[in-house]
From Swiss-Prot:
Pfam families: RNase_PH, RNase_PH_C
Species of the source: Trichormus variabilis (strain ATCC 29413 / PCC 7937)
Keywords from the UniProt entry: Nucleotidyltransferase, RNA-binding, rRNA processing, Transferase, tRNA processing, tRNA-binding
Molecular function (Gene Ontology), one example: tRNA binding
SUPFAM superfamilies in the record: Ribonuclease PH domain 2-like, Ribosomal protein S5 domain 2-like
Gene that this sequence comes from: rph
Coiled-coil parts of chain: none
GO biological process, one term: rRNA processing
Record's protein name: Ribonuclease PH
Oligomer status and interactors: Homohexameric ring arranged as a trimer of dimers.
Matching NCBIfam families: RNasePH
């Protein structure tokens, strides 16, 4: 039996993706990322300091925080006040690791970039939307730092995007929504760079197992989506050619 996508998309088709830049007033970088019905506000703040282990090194740092509004899902969930859940800690570490692959920390100097990803509405794919939108917010923040003369040269040496894929009825599907995420027997989160090099793969079988052939199908599916996301990011970053210093 062939899986029928609830929104009528083809197996390798992304949900509509939109980046609303300069979304908030005070953060140097702020982007509302809308991926289908998933909405994530990504902001980037800059501090003129680094963690102790980097003090005096001349290098900067990037870290990330991730939260969900209590009403982001159908049933309200409690705010994480005193202790973060394991899921939240895992996701924000993933966001930080992924976006650090895009930065030349020597060019950044002894500064810390903090990426805040706040989920306003969740229909699956929140962590991948946070990474993809977080990169656009990161570029926006770097652009502002260059315009203000804080940075002499751009530290944006990489481009990063992420997407979810999964097996439904033993076939690969791109960019799962919540209904599909629940139904999938295997689901992956894949992070890649501009050259389609793999930064991170998170994958698990919810029941049973999957073959090497299916693994390759899932990665091919993710690659197709990430190619489109990379193009969408560049279109959203108005001064992309001046900012990007990588290959």
């Amino acid at each position: 039996m062939v899986w029928q996508r609830p929104d009528g998309r083809k197996p390798y088709e992304l949900r509509p993706i939109n980046f609303h830049t300069k979304f908030t007033r005070f953060a140097p970088g702020s982007v509302l990322t809308i991926c289908g019905e998933t909405k994530v506000l990504c902001t980037v703040s800059v501090a003129e300091s680094v963690p102790k282990f980097l003090a005096g090194s001349g290098k900067g740092w990037l870290t990330a925080e991730y939260r969900m509004l209590p009403s982001a899902t159908q049933q309200r969930h409690e705010r994480e006040l005193l202790k973060l859940s394991g899921r939240t800690q895992e996701i924000q570490r993933l966001i930080g690791r992924s976006l650090r692959a895009a930065i030349d920390f020597e060019a950044l100097g002894e500064r810390t970039l903090t990426v805040d990803a706040d989920v306003l509405q969740a229909d699956a794919g929140t962590r991948t939307a946070a990474i993809t939108g977080g990169f656009v917010a990161l570029a926006e923040a770097i652009s502002q730092l260059l315009q203000r003369g804080v940075l002499e040269r751009s530290p944006l040496c990489g481009q990063v995007a992420a997407v979810s894929v999964g097996l439904l009825e033993q076939e690969a599907y791109l960019d799962l929504n919540y209904i599909e995420d629940v139904a999938a027997t295997v689901d992956f989160n894949v992070v890649m760079n501009k050259n389609l090099g793999i930064i991170e793969v998170q994958g698990t079988a919810e029941e049973g197992s999957f073959s090497r052939t299916q693994l390759n199908q899932l990665l091919d599916c993710a690659e197709t989506g990430i190619q489109q996301l990379l193009i969408a990011q560049q279109k959203a970053i108005t001064d992309w050619d001046e900012l990007f210093v990588g290959k």
